[in-house]
């Protein structure tokens, strides 16, 4: 379930983000919910949920899920989020991890945010095996997109685009900068600012984390916030706590102390870190300004990225199907092994051929007998024919194993060249001309 910058707008994203603390823990208390993970960024709030196979049969449908979310107080997400399921959800998650649905197309910051969200969900023990697996595979694919296309090389991040806009209004070379906040965006801002030749970076934190942050990032702590605001050429606000980092009163004092020099503020907080009304003499570049200024990506790079994602989704789907069928393959081998053991028990201890030699021979035969159907199981998983293989095993050998229902519909992956992304509507074969050389380099 997602609210994002493109569909619902940044205002709704900001409202939703303020309501999702503790949502994963609350949802996993429900007996029909196996796992939950919340991803909250400046672009979106995304809730990933795995329900039990019998959830719908027992009355736990979309409406019930939305009620659970609303009961936690996350009303904006419950009322406004778009819901996608199974295959569509997998595609969406892979695209989000690769930055394909970000405000800045192809940006890498979201991958780090998703990795931290997964770590937090694991710490809270709310993530199921399937959710953890799909997120890890999505992150792996996002790294391939970063290394095999030029999207990451273009510096396509929210921070970079924001500083590009600042550079159109002032000279960053030799500038004095105040960073208000100590989170991931603060770290990214310091790195970007250093690479652009600023003379001084000071950091301020209302939570008392500035000293440690300053040591780690080799910047200085702003001990007097009013003095720092008066002297700074640029202020970067990225606290995002819901309480403005720069109050209207502090901004007015800074304007008065600057004696006619305007104050430039780059506000990277989704909820807005500059209190309104913004006084005269203060110019704010916020996320909405950045969104409108994002440059278009090259079509060839976009196609290459889509092709890599399609390959990653297929690899994940096949791996999931193989794992689902593994108990049946084990059961087949156990049946053959039991037959061999039964025959060995019938052999006389004294015979023309030693029992050990007969046992070794029979076990080699058993391994050969198990190899072909095991290989067929792998082929069936790749072709979306897993259930047909399982039914054949039951019909021919009478082996029945309680196998979980497929997490995603494998039939859409039977022919990789005909796979269609439900988000973009693009087929893999449409992307292959320009993107195949890069995509084929992948071996894992």
Curated annotation (Swiss-Prot):
Residue positions of the active site: 42 (nucleophile)
Presence of keyword Oxidoreductase: yes
Q: Where does NADP(+) bind?
A: 181-186
Decide whether keyword Ligase is in the record: no
Q: Would you say which domain of life the source belongs to?
A: Bacteria
Per the record, the GO terms for biological process are:
protoporphyrinogen IX biosynthetic process from glutamate
Q: What is its EC number?
A: 1.2.1.70
InterPro entries documented for this protein: 4pyrrol_synth_GluRdtase, 4pyrrol_synth_GluRdtase_dimer, 4pyrrol_synth_GluRdtase_N, GluRdtase_dimer_dom_sf, GluRdtase_N_sf, NAD(P)-bd_dom_sf, Shikm_DH/Glu-tRNA_Rdtase
Belongs to which family? Belongs to the glutamyl-tRNA reductase family.
**Free-text note on domains in this protein's UniProt record:** Possesses an unusual extended V-shaped dimeric structure with each monomer consisting of three distinct domains arranged along a curved 'spinal' alpha-helix. The N-terminal catalytic domain specifically recognizes the glutamate moiety of the substrate. The second domain is the NADPH-binding domain, and the third C-terminal domain is responsible for dimerization.
Say what the protein does: Catalyzes the NADPH-dependent reduction of glutamyl-tRNA(Glu) to glutamate 1-semialdehyde (GSA).
Q: Which protein, by its recorded name, is this?
A: Glutamyl-tRNA reductase
């Amino acid at each position: 379930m997602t609210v994002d910058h493109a569909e619902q707008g940044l205002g709704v994203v900001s409202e939703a983000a303020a309501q999702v603390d503790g949502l994963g823990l609350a949802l996993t208390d429900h007996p029909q919910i196996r796992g939950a993970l919340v991803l909250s960024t400046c672009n979106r709030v995304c809730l990933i949920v795995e329900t039990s196979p019998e959830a719908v049969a027992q009355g736990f449908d979309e409406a019930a899920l939305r009620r659970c979310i609303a009961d936690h107080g996350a009303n904006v997400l419950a009322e406004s989020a778009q819901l996608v399921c199974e295959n569509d959800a997998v595609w969406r998650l892979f695209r989000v991890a690769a930055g394909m649905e970000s405000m800045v197309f192809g940006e890498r910051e979201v991958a780090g945010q998703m990795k931290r969200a997964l770590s937090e969900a694991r710490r809270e023990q709310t993530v199921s095996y399937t959710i953890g697996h799909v997120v890890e595979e999505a992150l792996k694919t996002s790294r391939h997109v970063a290394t095999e296309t030029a999207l990451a090389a273009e510096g396509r991040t929210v921070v970079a685009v924001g500083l590009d806009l600042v550079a159109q209004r002032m000279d960053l070379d030799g500038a004095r900068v105040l960073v208000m906040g100590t989170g991931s965006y603060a770290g990214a801002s310091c790195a970007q600012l250093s690479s652009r030749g600023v003379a001084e970076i000071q950091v301020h934190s209302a939570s008392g984390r500035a000293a440690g942050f300053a040591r780690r990032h080799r910047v200085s702590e702003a001990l007097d916030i009013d003095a720092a605001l008066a002297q700074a050429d640029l202020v970067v606000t990225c606290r995002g706590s819901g309480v403005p980092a720069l109050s209207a009163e502090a901004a007015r004092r800074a304007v008065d102390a600057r004696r006619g020099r305007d104050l430039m503020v780059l506000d990277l907080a989704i909820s807005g870190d500059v209190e309104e009304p913004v006084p005269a003499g203060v110019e704010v570049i916020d996320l909405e300004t950045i969104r409108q200024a994002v440059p278009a990506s090259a079509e060839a790079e976009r196609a290459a990225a889509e092709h890599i994602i399609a390959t990653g989704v297929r690899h994940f789907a096949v791996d999931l199907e193989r794992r689902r069928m593994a108990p049946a393959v084990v059961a087949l081998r156990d049946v053959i092994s039991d037959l061999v053991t039964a025959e060995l028990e019938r052999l006389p201890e004294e015979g023309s051929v030693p029992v050990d030699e007969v046992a070794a021979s029979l076990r080699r035969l058993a391994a050969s007998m198990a190899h072909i159907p095991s290989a067929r199981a792998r082929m069936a998983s790749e072709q979306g024919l897993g259930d047909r293989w399982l039914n054949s095993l039951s019909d021919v050998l009478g082996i029945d194993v309680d196998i979980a229902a497929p997490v995603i519909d494998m039939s859409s992956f039977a022919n990789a060249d005909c796979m269609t992304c439900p988000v973009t509507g693009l087929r893999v074969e449409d992307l292959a001309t320009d993107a195949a050389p890069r995509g084929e380099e992948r071996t894992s």
